[in-house]
A protein has these predicted regions:
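Domain-level signature for soluble enzymes in the chorismate/prephenate branch of the shikimate pathway
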Residues: 1-263
């Protein structure tokens, strides 16, 4: 878990237990399924980069975890290198695809000739730079990663805009407790011609559409997994959950409240 992910979890459950990193999102989810961890945190969507599709795919593939919370964090991206490095030294910049996308304008202006290297996460990029000891390689990651991996901050706020935010899902092997949950996330696995009808059924149940993303279903052309998030500001009711679960192509991934940390 990188510094952004750990930050999102402390908003969800401040002071809870021990937070430890995993190399990949599937690894983190597997630990939850195996009972080795109570929760996992995965980024779901970014203001600039859109849906974090490879992480969403990992969530869809596992039927034994539930979304029990959502946290929205303001994102500040930082360029960091080994101790003693300077911006003039940098020839390669590594980060997650989202980190590279979010810093594209800054990189074009300040390091236009630097190559980029995509990593599994921004935290993995920071760790890679630290282990390399190479002054010519830098990472783009959250500011806390510099302290975590003993790196030097070379430039701050390299993201395109201060409006940059990321939504994180909190996952658990235990379904969320019943109560005043305001949001629901579901996956509809169907042909493209069917999704409009499903959206109508969701609307008729009294739920408002928040986001929808599609991913290829993988077995035939024209079939997709649609990840749909809906809300009811007054609280999602048991009846609404029953209606959604009765739609043949739909699997409910979880009901939850959403929390947002201000910059």
């Amino acid at each position: 878990m990188g510094s952004l992910l750990s930050g999102s979890f402390t908003v969800f459950l401040p002071g809870y237990g021990i937070i430890f990193p995993k190399a990949t999102v599937p690894d983190a989810i597997a630990d939850v399924v195996a009972g080795n961890a109570d929760f996992a945190v995965i980024p779901q969507e970014n203001t600039l980069g859109g849906a974090v599709t490879n992480y969403v795919d990992a969530l869809i593939a596992e039927e034994n975890v539930f979304v029990v919370g959502e946290v929205i964090l303001p994102i500040s991206q930082t360029l960091m290198g080994v101790q003693g490095a300077s911006i003039e030294d940098i020839r390669v910049i590594c980060s997650h695809a989202q980190g590279l996308a979010q810093s594209s304008e800054w990189r074009k202006e300040h390091l236009p000739d630097a190559d980029t290297q995509e990593m599994a996460s921004t935290a993995a990029a920071a760790n890679y730079v630290a282990e390399s000891g190479d002054r010519t390689i830098a990472a783009i990651a959250a500011p806390g990663a510099a302290e975590l991996y003993g790196l030097s901050i070379l430039a701050e706020n390299v993201q395109i805009t201060d409006a940059n935010k990321t939504r994180f899902y909190i996952l658990s092997a235990t379904p969320p407790e019943e109560g005043s949950q305001t949001h629901m996330v579901l996956v509809a696995s169907c042909e493209a011609s069917r999704i409009d009808d499903i959206i109508v059924e969701i609307h008729n149940a009294g739920l408002e559409l928040v986001t929808i993303h599609d991913r290829p279903e993988g077995s035939r052309l024209g079939a997709y997994h649609y990840i749909v998030e809906v809300e009811n500001g007054n609280g999602i009711t048991d009846k609404q959950i029953e209606i959604i679960k009765a739609i043949p192509e739909v699997r409910v991934l979880g009901c939850f409240k959403t929390m947002e940390k201000q910059r």
